[in-house]
């Protein structure tokens, strides 16, 4: 059966990362042409160099996608970084770096992508947040604040773009198993796993499946919402 997403054009920031590359793979399975916007080239998928912190870089990347494909249907902001320390020990430079990638990057992406989407047939936007954006976590003030900012951004933009046939939502993963998290101390990984009600880590493919759903026909009445993919981690211990 032909996918309703077949031949759609997507951009995915952070497409070289574990989550971003899983999202690209999931969209490609639905027949989407998914372009990775990142500073490094992934193993597969169309690629456009982009520094999400820089307005000119984002503008040029979106313009290149429009020139190449003629439209833009799906936008996913999966680029994300973290710098961890208790607030009074967190360097200003680290705070700024996290905000510039996670939150400013989302703003710049939407600022340039929405005019292209509205010139076409509308589309879907998905921001990759974190359960820590809703609940906070010790030592992650910069990261948690940036992800909390995505919530307000999505809810506000949802009101602004609905009449343009554009829907925007957030996927909030819990602890995702990636090469980075696998390198952390066993005690840290065990603590995260203990919070999961289903007894396993979230995999990048789990996040990608949620993104695919929000981009598909089953999500036509969903906008400005948070979809948590955390195995119940945000509910706390039972």
Q: Predicted segment positions?
A:
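Short C-terminal tail/terminal secondary-structure segment
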Residues: 135, 212, 223-238
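Active-site helix of classical SDR
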Residues: 110, 146, 154
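Active-site loop immediately N-terminal to the catalytic Tyr-X3-Lys motif
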Residues: 88, 135-141, 163-164, 199, ...
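Residue(s) in the substrate-gating loop at a strand-loop-helix junction
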Residues: 130
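Short, small/polar-rich loop/turn modules that mediate ligand/substrate recognition or access, typified
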Residues: 122, 162, 167, 222-224
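Substrate-binding pocket helix/loop in short-chain dehydrogenase/reductase
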Residues: 86-87, 94-96, 181, 192
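Alpha-helical segment proximal to the catalytic Tyr-Lys
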Residues: 115, 159-160, 220
């Amino acid at each position: 059966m032909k996918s309703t997403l077949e031949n759609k054009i997507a951009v995915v920031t952070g497409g070289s990362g574990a989550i971003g590359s899983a999202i690209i793979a999931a969209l490609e399975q639905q027949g989407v042409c998914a372009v990775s916007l990142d500073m490094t080239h992934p193993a597969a998928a169309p690629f456009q160099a982009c520094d999400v912190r820089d307005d000119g870089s984002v503008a040029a990347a979106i313009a290149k996608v429009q020139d190449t494909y003629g439209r833009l249907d799906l936008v996913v902001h999966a680029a994300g970084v973290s710098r961890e320390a208790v607030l009074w020990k967190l360097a200003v430079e680290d705070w700024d770096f996290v905000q510039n990638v996670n939150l400013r990057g989302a703003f710049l992406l939407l600022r340039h992508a929405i005019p292209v989407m509205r010139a076409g047939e509308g589309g879907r936007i998905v921001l990759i947040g974190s359960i820590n954006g809703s609940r906070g976590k010790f030592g992650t003030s910069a990261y948690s604040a940036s992800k909390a900012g995505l919530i307000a951004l999505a809810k506000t933009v949802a009101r602004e773009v609905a009449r343009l046939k554009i829907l925007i939502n957030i996927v909030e993963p819990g602890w995702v198993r990636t090469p980075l998290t696998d390198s952390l101390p066993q005690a840290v990984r065990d603590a995260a796993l203990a919070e999961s009600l289903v007894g396993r880590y979230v995999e990048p493919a789990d996040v990608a499946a949620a993104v695919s759903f929000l981009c598909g026909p089953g999500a036509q009445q969903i906008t400005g919402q948070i979809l948590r993919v955390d195995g119940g981690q945000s509910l706390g211990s039972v």
